[in-house]
Regions:
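Hydrophobic transmembrane alpha-helices and their immediate loop junctions
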Residues: 1-238
């Protein structure tokens, strides 16, 4: 359901967002520093900081999506809405720019926003911890450290060269400078599928979460390949 608008773009939240919100807050509350607030504050304040950190994290994800949307709008692409859901955020666009240079800038805009947020939070946090007496004894510095670190990780994760991550679109834009858009999509999707299989194999030995992410990546790559091919073929006959 809709919660507001930014830059004329409706912002919505999916029911899965409401389900994941308390889960993230719980994770932050039970993990010890620097990954959480366990043992740093009284229990009620711990939960409050954990929930606030979770809300601010999804606000950062919204800014990440707004980065994509801002560049897309500058190229005349209509943005239907931005939806926050279980695994982050999604910008619904009428179409993806097929000019490689435009898609490249649009795809990189999201990770760039995440990197800027992460670096600014970590640098400011370091400066304040170093020069403001007593600040290091509070849990506020920990909240900004967590948010800064996660934004850097979010930016790096989204640069993985596989759909539906931004890195998959960057890879397609690189291919599209050298071949047709359909073929570029197919190559980028195939690379993403191989990447997902490798990630799934690693997940069997190291972390089961990698298997879930691999499944998500494989399906995303397959759907992008299929939807792009159908869209372009329909344009030729309509």
């Amino acid at each position: 359901f809709k919660i507001g608008s930014i830059m004329g773009i409706p912002v919505k939240i999916h029911i899965t967002f409401l389900l994941i919100l308390p889960v993230f807050a719980l994770v932050f509350s039970i993990n010890e520093p620097p990954l959480g607030f366990a043992g740093t504050t009284p229990l009620i304040l711990n939960y409050a900081l954990s929930l606030l950190t979770t809300i601010l994290l999804f606000a950062c994800i919204l800014l990440h999506e707004l980065g994509h949307s801002y560049i897309a709008k500058s190229y005349g692409v209509e943005i239907k809405d931005i939806t926050l859901l279980l695994f982050g955020g999604v910008s619904s666009m009428e179409e993806i720019p097929r000019i490689p240079s435009q898609e490249l800038r649009m795809a990189f805009a999201g990770p760039f926003v995440s990197f800027v947020i992460g670096v600014v939070l970590l640098v400011l946090n370091y400066i304040v911890v170093s020069f403001v007496p007593g600040y290091a004894d509070t849990s506020i510095w920990l909240m900004f450290y967590i948010l800064g670190s996660i934004n850097i990780i979010l930016g790096l994760f989204n640069l993985l060269p596989a759909f539906p991550m931004d890195g998959g679109r960057l890879l397609r834009a690189w291919y599209a400078k050298r071949m047709s858009y359909i073929k570029a999509t197919h190559y980028a999707a195939s690379f993403g599928k191989m990447f997902a299989v490798l990630m799934g194999i690693l997940g069997l030995f190291f972390n089961p979460w990698l298997i879930l992410i691999a499944f998500f990546v494989y399906i995303g790559a397959s759907e992008e390949d299929k939807s792009t091919t159908i869209s372009i073929l329909l344009e030729k006959y309509i």
